[in-house]
Design a protein with these regions (language model features):
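Short, well-structured N-terminal submotif of metal-dependent ribonuclease cores
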Residues: 1-49, 64-71
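Acidic, PIN/NYN-like endoribonuclease modules and their adjacent C-terminal/linker elements
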Residues: 1-14, 112-113, 117-141
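Active-site neighborhoods of divalent-metal-dependent phosphate/nucleic-acid chemistry enzymes
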Residues: 3, 82-122
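Histidine- and aromatic-rich ligand-binding microenvironments
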Residues: 17-18, 49-50, 104-105, 127-128, ...
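A generic structural signal for short hydrophobic patches within well-formed alpha-helices
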Residues: 22, 54, 130-131
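Residues that scaffold the ATP/ADP-binding catalytic core of kinase and kinase-like folds
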Residues: 24-26, 60, 133
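Short, well-structured alpha-helical segments
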Residues: 73-77, 92-93
Length: 141
């Protein structure tokens, strides 16, 4: 099994991003890792930002860095706008919009956006906050 290696420029790679790389880039903390993360994000041909990583980034920005909801959404939109980032962009942007404007937790906002983008008809949940978004039906189990 291959071990870790220091990555420089290798065009044509497809690489999954971990939360810590995105957070270092967005926060500048700590400075040396932030510089490396920013350089890495700028030089890769295709970097995949998984939905779960974006969700964890939101959690870290809010809980560790105490970034407010609008600031968190803005930072994540900036990450999604990077030309090297590949993601379910439309779905995630809609989830961020719901998270920010309708004030749902990101997991519920993501579920609402997923319903809107698929042929799924409703969400089974006890969370009444979902009712703030009129585009989906919540079913109480």
């Amino acid at each position: 099994m291959a071990g870790p290696r220091q990555e420089t420029e290798r065009a044509g790679l497809t690489v999954l991003l971990d939360t810590n790389v995105v957070i270092r880039h967005l926060t500048g903390d700590p400075p040396e890792m932030a510089r490396r993360a920013t350089r890495f994000l700028a030089t890769k041909a295709e970097l995949v930002l998984a939905d779960v990583v974006l969700a964890e980034c939101i959690y870290v920005l809010q809980s560790v860095y105490e970034v407010d909801r609008p600031g968190t959404a803005e930072l994540m939109r900036a990450a999604l706008a990077m030309p090297t980032i590949t993601a379910e962009t439309d779905l995630l942007l809609r989830a961020l919009e719901i998270y920010e404007l309708d004030r749902l937790d990101f997991a519920e906002a993501y579920l609402v956006a997923a319903v809107e983008f698929t042929d799924v008809e409703s969400i089974a949940s006890f969370d009444k906050a979902i009712d703030r978004v009129s585009s989906v039906e919540r079913i109480v189990p």
